[in-house]
Amino acid sequence: MGKRISFLLLLFALFHVLILPVMGENSVTHLFPAYRYEGIVTKDSEGVSVGDVVKMIESESGKSHLVMKSNGKRIRLPWDAVTPIQKESPSLPAVTAEDVVAFVYKMGYTSKTDYMLFTDLSRFRTYLLEYGDEGWEMTRSLPCAVGDPYHPTPSGRFEIDYKCSCIGKTDQYLCRHAMCFYGSYMYHSVLLDWKGEAVLDGRLSSAISHGCIRLSPEDSAALYAIIPTGTAVYIR
């Protein structure tokens, strides 16, 4: 009887030491699935055939798409050679600040500064993390708008290269608090009129931009005020 109890206690201990941590890690990873912009090839070109499904990485509006083939090779295709696949927003469970932090540690995310930005394309959320005495802590969860199917928001690891108080198109629109992380891709406010006073398009929590990540005027201002250049950006 004593040996049986000892054996059961050993199994119980092994379950908690070996099995539960793995289950926990997997569940955290599954909470944040990688979003994938995809398109269907409509013209034979550079080793791809009509009907092939490719991953869309970035686009130059009206000119070309940078895509990834099934073998991992990246190629640039003419604008009209790919038709983006329209996707429904995935139904995902709500996540807590603890979930976000656990995922960041699980993935090994790091930053050169005491700040980190993590944008969850599936949930249309941008999380601000700050590093303190106890490690990373999520301090803000912000609704955002991301790239539409024709203009994907690039995924991966980036850094804030530079900041600009405003950008825009003369006499058409203006965006405030721009923070560039990759080429012409940046975080910035929603679209304002040319004077920067009235909101022209304040939509958030949707895929409607040309690849940049839009935030409310208040949230973009808050990030702009504290995020230094060199801060890591993770987009998934």
Q: What residue ranges belong to the model's regions?
A:
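Boundary regions of SH3-family modules and the immediately adjacent low-complexity/disordered segments
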Residues: 68-110
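Sec-dependent N-terminal signal peptides of Gram-positive bacterial secreted proteins and lipoproteins
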Residues: 2-23
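Beta-loop motif signature
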Residues: 26-58
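Exported/periplasmic cell-wall-interacting domains
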Residues: 152-155, 164-236
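SH3/SH3-like beta-barrel superfamily modules
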Residues: 45-80
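A structural motif detector for short, solvent-exposed N-terminal "entry" segments of globular domains
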Residues: 102-148
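Extracytoplasmic
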Residues: 36, 62, 112-114, 121-124, ...
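Short, surface-exposed secondary-structure edge patches
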Residues: 43-47, 149, 223-226
